[in-house]
Structures are given as structure tokens and as C-alpha cells.
Amino acid sequence: MIIKTKYHGETQIQEDQTIVFKNGLPGFTGEKKFVILPLSEDSPFVVLQSVQSEELAFIVASPFVFFKDYGFDLDETTVELLEIESAEDVEVMAILTIEEPFEKSTANLMAPIVVNRRKMLAKQVILHDSSYLTKQPIGGEAC
């Protein structure tokens, strides 16, 4: 199918590339289908693009690129919702806010996106009782 995207114009995607957020994203509960697209060839960043809304796209990256010791436990409800059977099925992404200069850019570590890559199910998880920030500076080490 062809979708309209924020950063790449019209783009051909396969149905099996679609990631389903059963409950939508916080603030975007009606948006349930997304696809991951490259931002550029050599970038650690990718685009989490809504299949339904052209303008709804987030720059995301693995938080481990910037924060090697990042970690959290998933609650049983999330494990069941995402049908996670193995840790190898899980990919974690952080939504980034890219600023100029890049050193001012931040990552939302308090609300990571957890994806079951085998089942193509995802959820943005809110880490209550966490010391992580919604605007954690990432610095320039991935440039």
C-alpha cells in the first residue's frame, strides 16, 4: 500500500511492516497503525510514521545508543497486551526531540515505546516511579 509520510512523501509499505498500537499512543488514541522508516542511510534515528495521518511522525532511536545502562521491567499487563514470549522479540525505542544545535536534543526515557517485533504489536509504556526524564539530554555522541 502507498502512504503519505511527513519526511518521505508518498512511500510504498507492505502490510506486514505495520506496527499496531492496540490502544493508540497517549494523546493520539485513534492512531493505531504505524510503520518504521529510515530517516537517512547511516543514521541511528528512524521515523515512527502513522499509516493514517501524514503529519504524525516521530523521530525515534534505541535509547541504548545514548544510555548504555538504560533499563526497566515490563509489567505483566504489558507483556500480555504485546503477546511477548521472549526478550528477543522486544525492541525498545525512545521518542526524540531534535534541537539545533544537536547537543540540546532530548530523549523521552520515561515513556519508551516497546515493540514486539515478531507480532508487530507496540505500546508506549509510562514508567511510573522512575528517575528517568521525559526530556533527557542526549548530547552529541551519536552525531
From Swiss-Prot:
Keywords: Bacterial flagellum biogenesis, Chaperone, Cytoplasm, Translation regulation. GO terms for biological process: bacterial-type flagellum assembly; regulation of translation. It comes from the Bacteria. It is found in: Cytoplasm. SUPFAM superfamilies: BH3618-like (SSF141457). Pfam families: FliW. GO terms for cellular component: cytoplasm. The keyword Chaperone applies. The keyword Transferase does not apply. Acts as an anti-CsrA protein, binds CsrA and prevents it from repressing translation of its target genes, one of which is flagellin. Binds to flagellin and participates in the assembly of the flagellum. Belongs to the FliW family. Interacts with translational regulator CsrA and flagellin(s). This is Flagellar assembly factor FliW. It comes from Bacillus licheniformis (strain ATCC 14580 / DSM 13 / JCM 2505 / CCUG 7422 / NBRC 12200 / NCIMB 9375 / NCTC 10341 / NRRL NRS-1264 / Gibson 46). The gene is fliW.
